[in-house]
Amino acid sequence: FVLVDTGAGIAAKSVDFVAAAAEALLIVTPEPTAIADAYATLKVLRQRGGDLALGLLVNMADSAAEATDLHEKFQEMALRFLGAEIDNRGYIPLDRYVREAVKRQIPFVLASPPTPAAEGIGEVAGALLERESISELGRTGLFARALQQRNWSKRAD
């Protein structure tokens, strides 16, 4: 797995990098601006990412119901306007211990385990690792696809 945190929006070079992966995981908070940024990123990835598999992870959700509702609405919008299927990859709950750990400059998964957010990350990571397609990613993963997409015979001097 390679994690690319693009913040709001996505740069052209980041799109090429992400498009070389077998799957992109969009992480979104349940805030209008974050949802708009995730949709804009999705639109760019659909235009340049080819057959890239897509998933949505909701961060800082008040509840599982809020995360599910956000995924369903995002999926409906993505399917209607972009023809994109977005898998639900779970959620990480809003957790006051995260803010406290940031103030103390300590990773929250180490500062106060088991916090709700740390447990959420563990569940998401476990689900990603258990997926059957992981064994196949080695054949078509990031670096294999990057080599296919780039013309490495021409070098910039």
Spans of model-derived segments:
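An anion/phosphate-binding loop that grips the pyrophosphate of nucleotide cofactors and donors
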Residues: 21
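Beta-strand-loop-alpha "switch" segments that mediate conformational coupling across diverse proteins
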Residues: 82-107, 120-123
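Switch II (G3) loop of P-loop NTPases
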Residues: 1-16
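Conserved C-terminal guanine-recognition region of P-loop GTPase G domains, centered on the G4
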Residues: 35-54
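G-domain G4 guanine-recognition motif of GTPases
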Residues: 29, 54-68, 91-98, 113
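NTP-binding/hydrolysis catalytic cores, primarily Walker-type P-loop NTPases
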Residues: 107-157
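Short, well-ordered beta-strand core segments
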Residues: 2, 24-25
